[in-house]
Amino acid sequence: DEVIVLEASSEEGEALNLVNEIQELAWNRGFEYKDIAVLYRANFQSRVLEESFSQHKIPYRIENGLGFYNRPEVKKLLDYLRVISDPNSDAGDEALLSILNVPTRYIGRKVITQLEEEAASKGVHLYEALKSFRPDTPFIRKNVRELVAFLEPLTQLAHTLQPAEVINLLRNNLDYDRYVTDEDIPTPDDSKIQNLNQLQLAATRF
């Protein structure tokens, strides 16, 4: 077959072109989805493709990599959003455990167990217990206080702030870009930074 070149004015348009081509192959030309491969230049570009494929119920599998929303730097920011939007829930508990040490706060397994036990004894969720939690070690206690002081205003404003605004606040106030890249001055072409930019761009739609 001849090579076909399609132009698109946006990432979304490019993804829709791909969806149309895949549907044509699968519906009208006798191909199965497993016969079709999509190549892209950089990992951050998968976000729009994954969302478009999901919306159009096209099954896909990413070879030798993680789906966009499962990449660690993306997943941890989403966990922060879950804590902020719904702190006192089972989902909030799971998300809080995920971000306690993001960035590093040296909160070890023993301290986490103490927090879980305190929450259970009070019959509350982990975030509620965290607000009055007093670890024995002064340094850890200070880190816990700072985390609560950071999260609490955001939980109060969760329904007034836009998701993209919250992501921007998290990235700036936690120095998150430097944390995930382990670089003093993260560069825009770093794949993790590109993933975070894609997440923030996606969040502007909500």
Task: Specify the residue positions occupied by each region the protein language model found.
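Helical mechanochemical/support elements of P-loop NTPase systems and associated helical scaffolds
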Residues: E11-E14, L18, E32, A42-Q45, ...
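Helicase P-loop NTPase motor core
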Residues: D1-P59, R82-D90, T155, T160
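A short beta-strand-loop micro-motif that forms or neighbors metal/cofactor-
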Residues: A119-S132
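Short, amphipathic alpha-helical segments that act as regulatory/interfacial helices
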Residues: Q23, N43, E50, S54, ...
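General small-molecule cofactor/ligand-binding pocket signal
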Residues: L6, R61-E63, D177
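Conserved short internal alpha-helix adjacent to the catalytic or cofactor-binding core
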Residues: E2, Q55-R61, L66-P103
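Accessory C-terminal helicase-associated subdomains
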Residues: D86-G92, L96, P103, A129-F206
